[in-house]
Curated annotation (Swiss-Prot):
Signal peptide: none annotated. GO terms for molecular function: structural constituent of ribosome. One of its GO terms (cellular component) is chloroplast. It holds the Pfam family Ribosomal_S15. Belongs to the universal ribosomal protein uS15 family. Part of the 30S ribosomal subunit. This is Small ribosomal subunit protein uS15c. It is found in: Plastid, Chloroplast. It comes from the Eukaryota. SMART domains: Ribosomal_S15. SUPFAM superfamilies: S15/NS1 RNA-binding domain (SSF47060). The keyword 4Fe-4S does not apply.
Amino acid sequence: MNQNLSIRKRNKLKQDSGSPEAQISFLTLRVLQISSHLKMHTKDYSSKRGLRKVLGTRKRLLSYLCREDVSRYNKLLNNLGIRAAKK
């Protein structure tokens, strides 16, 4: 439910779920959920591995978006409140 609301807020079209912006915003929500879970369950190694996988996927999508359109990349970083990836 939160995922759909987040995607709709960040995208122009309601049915847009395949754009890099939509995917990155979905993955950012996922990162926040897993991070809050790990604060309570520090020894949950499966979740730590899942967090690393999600972060890697988000990093690849961010680098793709940076290559393709820097203005969209910068706007997305400001909207989501995340740092730029190291180059």
